[in-house]
């Protein structure tokens, strides 16, 4: 266990791998060498990191299945990211968390819609009351005897107040 976590040991293994690859592929024009070396380095690092982590997690944790599942999913997600995929593997727990979040958001939006609907109903009732107050009274209750084309039939002396309401008046404004 001490050898697995030792940084010098890990670095010496990586150097040994690089030296071995250099001796195997002596062709200096090898174009894929950096890619192969980086993939092998990542795989070695994952191997070195995952085994001690899983051993420690199994010893300290009571729920070993969930920890192993999480470690495996993390390793596969790392490999998928290195391969260039944007998709990730998710566990049922993560899916349930996302579904709970979506359901919570839907409930919040339904409550907001309910509040807005209640406000709109109150506004419609208020507009109906305002309309009922503003409704014009029926024509048969208003005395229209003074309004029927009096300028054609009556003279100035016959008007009720003594002057024709349809004639323009002179208005002077003070400056």
UniProtKB/Swiss-Prot annotation:
Single GO term (MF): channel activity
Residue intervals on the Cytoplasmic side: 52-175
Binding site for Ca(2+): 120, 123
Subcellular locations according to the entry: Host rough endoplasmic reticulum membrane; Host membrane, Host caveola; Secreted
Alphabetical keyword list: Activation of host autophagy by virus, Calcium, Enterotoxin, Glycoprotein, Host endoplasmic reticulum, Host membrane, Host-virus interaction, Ion channel, Ion transport, Membrane, Metal-binding, Secreted, Signal-anchor, Toxin, Transmembrane, Transmembrane helix, Transport, Viral ion channel, Virulence
Topology with respect to the bilayer: Single-pass type III membrane protein
Stored Pfam families: Rota_NSP4
Major place of residence: host cell
Spans within the Lumenal topological domain: 1-28
GO cellular component, one term: host cell rough endoplasmic reticulum membrane
Glycosites: 8, 18
Top-level division of the source organism's lineage: Viruses
Residue spans crossing the bilayer: 29-51
Posttranslational mods: The N-glycosyl content is primarily Man(9)GlcNAc, with a small amount of Man(8)GlcNAc.
Gene Ontology BP, a term: symbiont-mediated activation of host autophagy
Domain writeup: Binds 1 calcium ion per tetramer.
Family affiliation: Belongs to the rotavirus NSP4 family.
Quaternary data: Homotetramer. Interacts with the immature particle in the viroplasm. Interacts with host CAV1, early and late in infection. Interacts with host integrin ITGA1/ITGB1 heterodimer. Interacts with host integrin ITGA2/ITGB1 heterodimer. Interaction with microtubules blocks trafficking to the Golgi apparatus.
Function: Plays an essential role in the virus replication cycle by acting as a viroporin. Creates a pore in the host endoplasmic reticulum and as a consequence releases Ca(2+) in the cytoplasm of infected cell. In turn, high levels of cytoplasmic calcium trigger membrane trafficking and transport of viral ER-associated proteins to viroplasms, sites of viral genome replication and immature particle assembly.
Protein name per Swiss-Prot or TrEMBL: Non-structural glycoprotein 4
